[in-house]
Amino acid sequence: MSAVLAEQEAAQQALSPTDNRLVPRTELEAREVDALKANLVRYLDFEAQLLPGFRPLFREYEVGTKESVEYAGVRLAGRIDRIDVDGAGRAVVIDYKGSLSADYEPFATEGRPPAKVQTLVYAQVVKRLLGLDVVGALYVSYGRAPKVAGAYDGRVLETPHLPNMRYERCACPPEGERSFARLLDETEKRAASAVRALLAGQVDPAPAGPASCAWCPVTACLSRED
């Protein structure tokens, strides 16, 4: 692992700034890179427990660059960190994060839709684009305390294979409003509504979750959540 990290660190110098290269320019940034490498080494044991019946099919899968992809009534472009599949052709969409909050748990707040929808969007796109049976849309933190959040079909994925997850806030039942398929469809409907509002010039503050206002400097906002 140390050799791989050294190789990747050296390769950053040849990348352009538009490639989001990781090149420290100060002593503080150099220490941050060292901390990141230490976290990744510690993360290996956690990764070995994650989804043992699945294998990576795609890494850094680009969406909307070679083909036109529509989601919520508009063209979508992005990059999916990882798509895993099992022997039955079922797939899990994975996005890596440095840390995770309750906003990444779709059922963290009763009666409120998911605050973070990135992997839910990509899961719907993967179903359409690749024809895969997507059963999970996960966020995986590689930070000092690795954990998993997101949504998954509770009939397919087993809790021991999703370490450090609050399952009651993430598992989808087989049927009903909280089923995984229904969650993907409802998320797209919400996204379409938001797109229409933006195109109409409606930009009223509407916090999506408890942490949405954490870094907002507008303290006098009536919609602010503390």
Predicted ranges, named:
Residues 1-226:
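Structural signature of nuclease core domains in nucleic-acid processing machines
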